[in-house]
């Protein structure tokens, strides 16, 4: 009997080893076919890439109204010198009646975030090319093929799949500063036609590559579309890709006429702002919450993922272990709903406006009952005394409904998405959202003295807000920035 068991185990182990060997052989052959399909030596000797991409951008989960998806434009210009690691990453978002520019330059160990509206610059959050430009890199099937070759020892053959009415092989591969990617490789052509990866908050992200043509000796998709959980997010309109072209060193240098912005706040660890004895602003990176201890319970606002961790830090700092009774949801945008299930698991009632409830229900995995919601009609007061919180529903160009969270005892206003910046000092750059929020605040006459936000670590004064508004200028596409206007 024991001999029989040993034989069965040995047979099973042999089968597993054989299968693993077969998959390794398939993977090697598949990677070789991808390299050949994309240009062979031309791919292996890739030195630099330049991508100019224009998209239509359905504002999935980010529209002005939760009931209608608005359409914006998103234009991207990436130059990546793979030999030096230098990066030029220019982005333009044109929507909500305004232009939102972004430019980051990486030059060796230096990395700068440039404000094209004010001609000022500060340190970028990282000098890692994959952190700065990984999002655009993943839209290039050529760069995916190049990374697959580099990481073949760590890649995994997953099996066959049927995609877009054609046979494919699927491979899981690592990608720097990202969850693993799954590539769909056309079995006949060796070309990558799809890539998927998982986002812990938004679900499956899909990249679809079409219309492959030869450019500078390499095959490259001329049309790229990107979807979030099955909903279109970026729809390719035009795409120009060049490889191994001469690059000017000046492209990766600070342009003339830019002045330093100041020191960036370190948000790599949780930041704690004590606003008064019972009011705290706590967060990390780009997700922050405000907590108010009413004396019998806690009222919170700011719904990025990590809410539980922020609440625990509040309890450590304040010594208050009262329950989170209310979690205020500012608006329907999907990035602000990532902590919804944490709030529900903590036992909180979700305070919001009626038209935000469907977005919350869609974002939650817990199917919250109607009793877990408390809807605001124009305005509402929670708590009393030093723990009094006033909520006001206002409309701006950013969102049809925005709940303002105001604490009269500390004269503190909590905002999401309308104001702020990453720097410790100086005047934050106002945009159309800021101006629209100021117009909504004026008739409320709140008398706030401090502003904290859902995305920034700094505590702002009302003077910072006023200075930002005074420095605001309408911003249109500059003549010397064709990626914006075309």
Language model features: what each stretch is:
Residues 438-486:
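Divalent-metal (often Zn2+) His-rich catalytic cores of metallo-beta-lactamase-fold enzymes
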Residues 272-315, 402-421:
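Conserved beta-strand hairpin/beta-sheet module of binuclear metal-dependent hydrolase folds
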Residues 22-23, 27-120, 154-162, 305-306:
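N-terminal mature ectodomain segment of secretory-pathway/periplasmic proteins
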Residues 235-295:
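Zn-dependent metallo-beta-lactamase
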Residues 7-15:
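Bacterial N-terminal signal peptides
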Residues 22-29, 105-180, 187-189, 199-200, ...:
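Flexible, processing/modification-adjacent segments and terminal tails
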Residues 307-351, 445-447:
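Active-site metal-binding motif and surrounding structural segment of the metallo-beta-lactamase
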Residues 163-252, 408, 416, 421-422, ...:
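Gly/Pro-enriched, hydrophobic low-complexity segments
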């Amino acid at each position: 009997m024991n001999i029989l068991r040993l034989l069965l185990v040995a047979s099973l182990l042999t089968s597993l080893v054989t299968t693993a060997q077969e998959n390794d052989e398939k993977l090697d052959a598949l990677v070789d076919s991808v390299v050949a399909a994309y240009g062979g030596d031309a791919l292996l000797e890739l030195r630099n890439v330049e991508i100019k991409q224009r998209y239509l951008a359905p504002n999935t989960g980010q529209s002005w109204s939760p009931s209608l998806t608005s359409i914006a434009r998103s234009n991207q210009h990436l130059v990546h010198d793979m030999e030096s690691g230098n990066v030029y990453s220019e982005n333009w978002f044109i929507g909500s009646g305004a232009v939102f520019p972004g430019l980051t330059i990486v030059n060796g160990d230096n990395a700068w975030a440039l404000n094209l509206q004010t001609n000022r610059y500060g340190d970028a959050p990282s000098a890692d090319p994959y952190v700065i430009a990984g999002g655009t890199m993943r839209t290039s099937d050529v760069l995916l093929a190049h990374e697959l070759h580099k990481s073949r020892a760590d890649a995994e053959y997953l099996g066959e799949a049927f995609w877009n009415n054609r046979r494919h092989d699927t491979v899981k591969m690592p990608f720097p500063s990202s969850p693993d990617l799954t590539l769909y490789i056309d079995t006949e052509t060796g070309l990558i036609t799809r890539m998927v990866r998982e986002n812990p908050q938004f679900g499956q992200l899909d990249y679809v590559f079409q219309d492959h043509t030869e450019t500078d000796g390499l095959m490259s998709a001329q049309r790229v579309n990107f979807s979030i959980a099955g909903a279109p997010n970026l729809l390719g309109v035009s795409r120009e890709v060049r490889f191994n072209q001469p690059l000017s060193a000046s492209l990766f240098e600070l342009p003339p006429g830019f002045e330093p912005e100041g020191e960036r706040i370190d948000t790599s660890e949780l930041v704690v702002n004590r606003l008064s004895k019972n009011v705290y602003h706590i967060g990390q990176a780009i997700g922050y919450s405000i907590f108010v201890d009413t004396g019998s319970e806690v009222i919170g606002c700011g719904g990025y993922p990590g809410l539980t961790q922020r609440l625990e830090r509040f309890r450590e700092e304040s010594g208050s272990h009262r329950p989170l009774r209310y979690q205020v949801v500012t608006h329907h945008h999907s990035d602000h709903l990532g902590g919804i299930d944490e709030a529900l698991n903590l036992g909180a009632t979700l305070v919001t406006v009626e038209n935000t409830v469907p977005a919350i229900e869609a974002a939650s995995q817990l199917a919250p009952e109607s009793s877990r919601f408390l809807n605001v009609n124009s305005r509402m007061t929670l708590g009393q005394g030093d723990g009094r919180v006033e909520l006001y529903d206002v409309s701006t160009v950013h969102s049809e409904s925005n709940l303002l969270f105001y604490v009269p005892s500390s004269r503190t206003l909590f905002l999401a998405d309308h104001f702020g910046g990453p720097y410790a000092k100086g005047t934050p750059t106002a945009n159309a959202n800021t101006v629209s929020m100021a117009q909504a605040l004026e008739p409320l006459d709140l008398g706030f003295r401090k502003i904290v936000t859902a995305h920034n670590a700094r505590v702002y004064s009302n003077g910072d807000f006023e200075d930002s508004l005074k420095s605001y200028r309408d911003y249109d596409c500059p003549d010397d920035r064709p990626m914006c206007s075309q």
